[in-house]
């Protein structure tokens, strides 16, 4: 169940839609997503998908999500409700509480980065944390997708006994190794064009770099109201959201992936890129250092520091990027497999209590 699934949340849902090998007959899955994002769940049978009308993150859309969720809970009688992201978690758990005289599903909640991890005022962080502390009492298991998120949540008062660490995982890729070549260095950004994803940091950094051999492709669009403008720039190509197969093709053509986020749960985009042999140029925010190690699988710069990112873009060279990408591919194979993520998630579905 999700209030919005654009980006990494959709990838996670698609991945865990495949039950553990040999165990598919034990599960019947139903999904609730925005009707204009249903196509993000390609590969999932349409009869399993329920939708609601969403025009943005506004009160009417949130009320429609709550109403549709209550309908699904009453009709489908699920044993487990898995809520993805903060707004879904708040609304979904409130709906479940209201329906408890009639329906009592186990509640699994994955915030994909708690709201109190965002860059915001201390007052807002305290309010967000208070809401999560209250709602944890009606939550059976909270999935944290990074050690950073789990430790930070514990410091904000979320009980460790309710939390379970499950890293996002990715299916292994067996594509041919990249070759250095003599073409310009092709950089890639995939994600929402907003403040959280640090898209403004990337634009400022790229504008500072005095290199004619760099090309940047930006894939994504605004989802929330805090979107960043996309000014026309030399050597920058803007693309809307594309299909997963098209994203894979872009990964294959790129020389490096840029992830300048200000906060993350545990981003799927760098996992996808590393699985394709791409080095990642990432900020040091929240969970990203658990995935990207400086001068090992990519480059790491201080979050929000566009000059530091520009400095990295000034020094990168193709042969070194190839070496970093190959190391990153090995790290993903060893530590972040889809099979492990699926098995751990379904273990919670079977016994989602602490």
Describe every region a protein language model picked out.
Residues 294-295, 299-306, 314-319:
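Conserved acidic donor-binding segment of nucleotide-sugar-dependent glycosyltransferases
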Residues 241-242, 249-254:
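Short alpha-helical donor nucleotide-sugar binding micro-motif in glycosyltransferases
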Residues 1-7, 11-62, 152, 165, ...:
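N-terminal strand-loop element at the rim of the active site
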Residues 64, 106, 116-134, 172:
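Nucleotide-sugar donor phosphate/pyrophosphate-binding loop at the beta->alpha transition
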Residues 180-197, 203-206:
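Conserved donor-binding/catalytic core segment of Leloir-type glycosyltransferases
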Residues 227-245:
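Nucleotide-activated donor-binding/catalytic signature segment of Leloir-type glycosyltransferases, i.e.
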Residues 279-282:
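Short hydrophobic beta-strand element within catalytic cores of glycosyltransferases
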Residues 262:
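Aromatic "clamp/platform" in nucleotide-sugar-dependent glycosyltransferases that forms part
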């Amino acid at each position: 169940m999700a209030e919005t699934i654009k980006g990494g949340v959709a990838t996670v849902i698609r991945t865990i839609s495949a039950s553990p090998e040999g165990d598919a007959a034990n599960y019947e899955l139903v999904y609730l997503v925005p009707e204009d994002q249903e196509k993000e769940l390609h590969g999932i049978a349409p009869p399993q998908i329920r939708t609601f009308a969403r025009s943005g993150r506004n009160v009417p859309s949130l009320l429609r999500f709550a109403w549709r969720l209550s309908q699904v809970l009453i009709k489908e009688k699920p044993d487990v409700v898995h809520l993805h992201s903060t707004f879904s978690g708040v609304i979904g758990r409130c709906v479940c509480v209201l329906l408890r005289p009639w329906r009592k599903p186990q509640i699994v909640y994955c915030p994909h980065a708690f709201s109190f991890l965002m860059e915001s005022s201390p007052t807002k962080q305290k309010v967000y944390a208070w809401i999560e502390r209250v709602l944890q009492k009606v939550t059976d298991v909270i999935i944290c997708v990074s050690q950073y998120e789990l430790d930070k949540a514990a410091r904000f008062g979320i009980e460790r006994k309710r939390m379970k660490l499950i890293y996002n995982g990715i299916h292994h890729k067996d594509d041919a190794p990249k070759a250095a070549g003599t073409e310009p260095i092709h950089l890639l950004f995939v994600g929402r064009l907003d403040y959280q994803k640090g898209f403004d940091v990337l634009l400022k950094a790229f504008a500072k770099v005095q290199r004619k051999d760099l090309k940047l492709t930006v894939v994504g669009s605004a989802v929330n109201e805090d979107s960043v403008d996309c000014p026309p720039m030399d050597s920058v190509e803007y693309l809307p959201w594309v299909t997963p197969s098209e994203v894979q093709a872009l990964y294959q053509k790129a020389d490096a992936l840029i992830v300048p986020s200000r906060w993350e749960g545990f981003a799927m985009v760098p996992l996808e890129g590393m699985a394709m042999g791409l080095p990642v140029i990432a900020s040091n925010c929240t969970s990203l250092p658990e995935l990207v190690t400086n001068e090992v699988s990519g480059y790491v710069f201080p979050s929000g520091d566009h000059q530091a990112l520009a400095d990295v873009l000034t020094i990168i060279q193709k042969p070194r990027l190839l070496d970093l990408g190959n190391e990153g591919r090995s790290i993903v194979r060893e530590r972040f497999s889809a099979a492990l993520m699926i098995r751990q998630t379904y273990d919670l579905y079977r016994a989602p209590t602490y």
